[in-house]
Each structure stands twice: as C-alpha cells, then as structure tokens.
C-alpha cells in the first residue's frame, strides 16, 4: 500500500469495456477511482446509435466467449442476471450467402451442422468436422487458460514450461486457412470456417491457426445478444462501479499523462482545460498507440515503433433504419466474396475496399424486438476495409458519424459517379459510395430484396470517423494486429514501458528488432516499467474483442493490487470456496486416480502374468 493512510487513488483514462471493468475491480479492492471519458457516453466502440425508435450497436454485436462475461461479473460479486442483463441465444449463428446463390446455415445445433456439412462433403465430411471441433476446442481451452487469464510481462512468461509444452498444439505458425484445409476438403467449407478471422481484424490466410477458437466458441457455446443492445453490458459494469464508489466524468478529455522528472513514475493527468489531477495509479484505456504517441510527455522511438507495427483492419459501417421488416435476412448474415483471397489482399495489403467485399449484416431487431419500431427493422452493415495510410493519419478535418435520409441514399452511387473505383489512394467519400452501391447490389442479387427504397435513414462510420471519435490509431477498429510477433510477450505489456537505450537502433529492424527488444527488456527487469502507469484495451495484452478486454481488465487490476500490496477480493473469495467464476469447491473437477477400478487391476495382473510366463518360457525352453 502507498505510505499514506488514505485509500490509494486511481485514474482510468477512457470508459471502454476494459476501462470500466478495471475501474470496478479496483474500486472493489479499495481504490478511490475516477474514470475520465472524452465523449458524452461510455463504452467506446461498444456503444449505441439511436434514431427515432431505431437502435444500432455502433461496434460489437455478437457476444462470444460467454464464460469470460460470467466470470467477470462473478468476480465483481454479482451476475449478469442480477444486474438485469438478459442474454438471448441467436439461432442460427449465421446465414452465409455465396455468390452462386447457395446458402450455408452455421449453427450450434449438431443435427443442423450434420445436415449442412454432409450436403457438401458427405458423411466423412461430418466426421472431419467433429475432428475440427476437437482441435479448435483444444485451441480454445489452452488459449483461455494459458494466455487470456495470464499476464505476459516479458520473455520469461512465454518461456514457462507449462506454456511451451502446449505452444505447438496451438498451431501459431500455421494459418487458419491451412488448418481448415486439413478438415474441410471443399473451397466452400474452408471459407465457411475461416471468415471469422475478420473478428481479429486479420485475413484468414495470415491469422494464426490458434484463432479457430473463435469458431469453436460460436459452434459449441453459441452466439448471444444482450436485450437492449451490447451496451447493456457496459451499463451494468458502470453501475457496479458506481456502487463501489467510482466517479465517472463524461466529456472530460485528457491532454497528457503526468510523469516524474525522470519519466519513471506516473503522477496523474492534465486535462484539456488545464486542470491537473493527481493519483497513485493511472490506467490508460484510450487507444494504446495514441497514448504512447500523444499522451506521454515525450515522443520516443518506442512510440514510433508502435506506429510501424501492422494494424488490424478498419471498417465502413452503415446503420440503416428500414420502413418494414425483411424476413429474408437472419439476425447475423455473412455475404462472402467470390474472389475470397483477393478480397482480403485488397484490405490487408492495399488498404482499400475490395472490388467485391465480404461483409457482415446484422439485424438486431430479428432477435430483440426493442431494436426497432413494431413491424420495422434496424440493420447494421460492416464492410471490412484497409486502415488509414500515413497521409490520412493526421487528417485535421473533423470526420464524425454522418447521417442522411433516403433521398440521398437512392442517388448516392450513380454508375457514372467519378472516383467510384479508387485503386491507388484512399478516397473515402468515393469508397463509402462504392461500398454502399456494392452492398445493396449484392444483397439484392442474393436475397431478391432491394433495400434501397426501404432505407428511411442512414448513419455511417468510416476509418476517419473511427479515428476522430475514438482516437483509434489509423482508424483500426481492432487495434494492433494479432500476428505471432504482435501477441504474447511481443504485444505491448499491461505495464507501460520506459524507453530503452537501443530503441532507436532496433526500430530499423522490424520484427527482428521487436524480438531483440523483448530479450533486452528481460534483462532490464522492472526497470523498463513506468511505475504506476498501466495499459488495458485492444492493443495491450491479451488482445482485442470485448471478452478479451474483460480478461485484460482482470489482469491489470490484479497486477495493480499486487504492486500496491492490496488484497484481491475475488481471489480471497475463491480461496474461501465461494462461487467465483462459476464453480464451488464441491464442483472442482478432479481426474480419477490410475488403477481405481477392479477392471484395471485385473488387466495389470494379466499383463504381469503373461510377461512372467513369457520370460520363463524364454529362459527354460
């Protein structure tokens, strides 16, 4: 504990999922916590857009890995149900639309999957599907246990024997596409079981095979949706925090993080209006690259190296209010491009919008009637696109969420519009028009429904607005990439890093420089950390996605409590055998001892007798 007898103080910058969950945990542990949010709403990307009775999830719309949500609320001494968060199961998971008019229903129902898989790959195909589930189940369990619930503060964390012995089982050096090819022998099914890499902001041809865990959680645990929108989870965490005494201050932007003269200790923050707030602990939940580049008082080579790391994709997102329901669309729909690999190359190599993109269509009103007026639908379309290039990173003009009515939409993309097919630079107005035109045309050709005359209101987000509203580096909606050299000990750590003596030189060597940086930092020990400054969110360990950021919030809170000698309430409760993380002591699984049945003893005796007789026969024959 700090030397003062007062409660230790903490400031959290940003009220995203990672920030509010960390704040609630710290407050429960006895910290006096203040959350500073630049916008007038909480949740960051996990927020809502409203228009005359229509409701849209601005960012996440799929609740995956439900165990991590239940664990978070249990460790905060409550539950989703107690906080009034009702989860609805989406069935089917997705309707996948192909360019040839065929459809594939993805479901957590094995009987449905048996029919769907056997339609394309026969009975042996279903057997291979079960083998795929077995492998992805291994990826899921190992990743949660050894990665998501553990902190990787440096090289030594990655060299743990219990982790290394499982490393190759995670298939980090093979792509999801390669692993899928071992189980699915048609191009169609390989596409069905790899598009989910988009949720990590990566191409399936580059994403490590480990991330088939996403397919596993969808297929085994299902896809869920909170009634009232995904922001209901954030609202519940905010209420828990407020009960514990957290002070949430909206429209309070942070100008910089205050450090000691030697840059080794965090002292507090300076606000945009010039006020200074002091604290024992500062937790940054703003975009990590932005924080290192803009909030720390001195720009360092490390901040420069973060800007040079590969980022995830961005998106052009449309939020459409329809004047009637469209039953041809399920709650979750995927429209896959015919030129599958080329579409991902356009996004991740050229940083443009593909000529024919794969895209996701969410109809929240299909599962939650409160998302739209009676008899109408709210529709969200997410089109993955390349993140901002260097020339657009520092765009000075404001780019906010934009809105328009049908008169603008129906004529927004005439065939002769100039600049409609940008191929060499990021002409965002043209790319948004191109995306709208392509999406409406694709939906019509594959469902026989023309949405254009049904849209009575549209809001849009683009990489520019993502950057402007949420300070996202390059407008990358999922933070830094999750390639191998951007995860585990190579990902920015939860403790903020002080500049190293060789950072400028290592900057020139890319991935090799990053590996060398990790090795050097191992020798620097705690001397590499800025004391009292921590990072939580998509670009810090363990990574991106709402459930992953919840796991990150737990890691950071436990790390802070350990650093300041504060008891961790949920760990104490776990030791006392209370219901934490969904299990009591009576429910802990223990594998049976070997030789615990008479059949095993008889088998051993038979083997011994056969062995003895064989030895005697060989000796005395």
From Swiss-Prot:
<dbReference type="InterPro" id="IPR008150">
    <property type="entry name" value="Phytoene_DH_bac_CS"/>
</dbReference>
<dbReference type="GO" id="GO:0016627">
    <property type="term" value="F:oxidoreductase activity, acting on the CH-CH group of donors"/>
</dbReference>
<dbReference type="InterPro" id="IPR002937">
    <property type="entry name" value="Amino_oxidase"/>
</dbReference>
<feature type="compositionally biased region" description="Polar residues">
    <location>
        <begin position="397"/>
        <end position="414"/>
    </location>
</feature>
<keyword id="KW-0472">Membrane</keyword>
<dbReference type="InterPro" id="IPR036188">
    <property type="entry name" value="FAD/NAD-bd_sf"/>
</dbReference>
<feature type="region of interest" description="Disordered">
    <location>
        <begin position="394"/>
        <end position="425"/>
    </location>
</feature>
<protein>
    <recommendedName>
        <fullName>Phytoene desaturase</fullName>
        <ecNumber>1.3.99.30</ecNumber>
    </recommendedName>
</protein>
<comment type="similarity">
    <text>Belongs to the carotenoid/retinoid oxidoreductase family.</text>
</comment>
<comment type="function">
    <text>Phytoene desaturase involved in the carotenoid biosynthesis pathway. Converts phytoene into 3,4-didehydrolycopene via the intermediary of phytofluene, zeta-carotene, neurosporene and lycopene, by introducing up to five double bonds into phytoene.</text>
</comment>
<dbReference type="InterPro" id="IPR014105">
    <property type="entry name" value="Carotenoid/retinoid_OxRdtase"/>
</dbReference>
<dbReference type="Pfam" id="PF01593">
    <property type="entry name" value="Amino_oxidase"/>
</dbReference>
<keyword id="KW-0560">Oxidoreductase</keyword>
<keyword id="KW-0732">Signal</keyword>
<feature type="transmembrane region" description="Helical">
    <location>
        <begin position="598"/>
        <end position="618"/>
    </location>
</feature>
<dbReference type="GO" id="GO:0016020">
    <property type="term" value="C:membrane"/>
</dbReference>
<comment type="pathway">
    <text>Carotenoid biosynthesis; lycopene biosynthesis.</text>
</comment>
<keyword id="KW-0125">Carotenoid biosynthesis</keyword>
<keyword id="KW-0520">NAD</keyword>
<keyword id="KW-1133">Transmembrane helix</keyword>
<keyword id="KW-0812">Transmembrane</keyword>
<dbReference type="GO" id="GO:0016117">
    <property type="term" value="P:carotenoid biosynthetic process"/>
</dbReference>
<feature type="signal peptide">
    <location>
        <begin position="1"/>
        <end position="23"/>
    </location>
</feature>
């Amino acid at each position: 504990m700090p030397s003062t007898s007062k409660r230790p103080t903490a400031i959290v910058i940003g009220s995203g999922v990672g920030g509010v969950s960390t704040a609630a945990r710290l407050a429960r542990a006895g910290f006096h916590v203040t959350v500073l949010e630049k916008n007038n709403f909480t949740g960051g990307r996990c927020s809502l857009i409203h228009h005359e009775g229509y409701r849209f999830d601005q960012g996440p719309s799929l609740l995956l890995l439900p165990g991590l949500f239940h664990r978070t609320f249990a460790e905060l001494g409550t539950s989703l149900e107690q906080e009034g968060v009702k989860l609805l199961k989406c069935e089917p998971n997705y309707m996948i639309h192909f360019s040839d008019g065929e459809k594939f229903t993805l479901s957590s129902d094995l009987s449905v999957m048996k029919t769907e898989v056997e339609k394309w790959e026969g009975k042996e195909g279903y057997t291979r599907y079960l083998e795929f589930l077995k492998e992805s189940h291994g990826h899921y369990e190992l990743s949660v246990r050894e990665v998501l619930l553990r902190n990787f503060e440096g090289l030594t964390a990655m060299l743990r024997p219990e982790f290394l012995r499982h490393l190759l089982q995670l298939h980090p050096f093979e792509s999801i596409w390669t692993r899928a090819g071992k189980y699915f022998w048609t191009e169609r099914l390989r596409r069905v079981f790899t598009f989910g890499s988009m949720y990590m902001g990566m191409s399936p041809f580059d994403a490590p095979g480990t991330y088939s865990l996403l397919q596993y959680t969808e297929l085994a645990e299902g896809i869920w949706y909170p009634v009232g929108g995904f922001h209901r989870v954030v609202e519940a965490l905010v209420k828990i925090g407020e009960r514990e005494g957290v002070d949430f201050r909206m429209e309070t932007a942070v100008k910089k993080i205050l450090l000691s003269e030697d840059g080794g200790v965090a002292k507090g923050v300076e606000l945009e209006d010039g006020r200074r707030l002091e604290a024992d602990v500062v937790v940054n939940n703003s975009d990590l690259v932005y924080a290192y580049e803009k909030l720390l008082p001195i720009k360092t080579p490390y901040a420069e190296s973060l800007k040079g790391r590969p980022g995830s994709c961005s998106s052009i997102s449309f939020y459409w209010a329809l004047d009637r329901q469209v039953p041809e669309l399920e709650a979750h729909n995927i429209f896959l491009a015919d030129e599958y690999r080329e579409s991902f190359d356009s996004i991740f190599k050229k940083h443009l919008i593909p000529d024919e993109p794969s895209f996701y269509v969410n109809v929240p009103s299909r599962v939650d009637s409160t998302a739209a007026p009676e008899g109408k639908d709210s529709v969200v379309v997410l089109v993955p696109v390349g993140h901002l290039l260097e020339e657009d990173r520092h765009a000075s003009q404001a780019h906010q969420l934009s809105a328009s009515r049908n008169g603008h939409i129906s004529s927004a993309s005439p065939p002769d519009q100039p600049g409609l097919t940008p191929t060499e630079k990021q002409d965002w107005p043209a790319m948004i028009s191109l995306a709208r035109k392509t999406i409406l045309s694709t939906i019509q050709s594959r469902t026989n429904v023309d949405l254009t005359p049904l849209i009575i209101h549209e809001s849009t987000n683009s990489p520019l607005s993502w950057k402007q509203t949420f300070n996202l580096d390059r407008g990358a909606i999922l933070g830094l990439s999750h390639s191998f050299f951007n995860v585990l000990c190579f990902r920015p750590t939860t403790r903020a890093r002080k500049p190293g003596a060789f950072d400028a030189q290592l900057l020139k060597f890319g991935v090799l420089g990053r590996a060398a940086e990790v090795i050097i930092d191992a020798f620097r020990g705690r001397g590499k950390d800025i004391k009292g400054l921590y990072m939580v969110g998509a670009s810090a360990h363990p990574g991106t996605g709402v459930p992953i950021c919840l796991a990150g919030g737990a890691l950071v809170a436990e790390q802070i409590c350990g650093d300041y000698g504060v008891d961790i309430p949920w760990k104490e409760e776990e030791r006392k055998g209370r219901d934490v993380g969904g299990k009591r002591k009576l429910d802990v699984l223990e594998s049976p001892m070997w030789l615990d049945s008479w059949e095993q003893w008889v088998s051993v005796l038979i083997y011994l007798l056969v062995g003895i007789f064989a030895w005697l026969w060989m000796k005395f024959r």
